[in-house]
Amino acid sequence: MKKIAVVTGARSEYGLLRWVIDEIHHATELQLQLIVTGGHLSPEQGLTYRCIEEDGYDIDAKVDMLLSSDCASGIAKSMGMCSIGMSDAFLHLQPDMIVVLGDRYELLPIVGTALVMRIPI
């Protein structure tokens, strides 16, 4: 059985990924691994990881990456936190591949970590 880790960091892209998540979840030859990060874990953004749980999905890993600062240095530090957390999550979950969606800087540490760990994206 192939383990597919879907990484979601915001409600906006979760809405688009939900159909992919649902197909993976129901496929008998695939095992869904759900990793949430970014805005999903932010009280200021409504702790939207709860919406994912309300949709009936188990969250396999929560990777905190947000600092209160949105200056360049704060963003760089957040990206570093994300790399560390993703490394731990990938090491624990051992996914066969990851699925991401987006075009923002938050994806850089996710895909960078997967690349270094030789996990197909």
Language-model features and meaning:
Residues 5-8, 14-25, 65-121:
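Active-site and donor-binding regions of nucleotide-sugar-utilizing enzymes
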